[in-house]
Amino acid sequence: MSQSDRQKITNKIKEVLFADERIVFAYVFGSFLNSPSYRDIDAGIYLDKIARKDVFDGELEISKKISEACELPIDLIDIKILNFAPGHFLNNVFKNGAVLFSKNEKLLSKIIEETSLNAIANEYFAYQSLKELVPK
């Protein structure tokens, strides 16, 4: 798929997600961004309010909207709600993804900062644990 076609799809995804008042910010990430071939289109969204029990249904609902708007099979759309995502996943999205939009820059900056600080702290502990496990 050409870069131009990818940009058209990305713009359509942005349009669909931005129209949803619940979505505070959105990212696209994964192989769709830079790889010549890709398996699916990954997008991460942060909602102003969602219960943990509603995450799967929310991801499916938004995937369907994007699938219809982009005229792509739903199995090509992989939406992840980021509200309860583990830190290492968030760190990867923020580091390697591309922001589509943010309706609240202050909140986005706060989450990125917290995720980065946690990653740094966890890196130290992981390194210390590894040193204890690996014989000299």
What are these regions (language model features)?
Residues 1-25, 33-38, 52-136:
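Catalytic core of pol beta-like nucleotidyltransferases
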Residues 40-42:
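Histidine-centered divalent-metal-coordination microenvironment in nucleic-acid enzymes
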Residues 44-48:
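Short hydrophobic/aromatic beta-strand micro-patches
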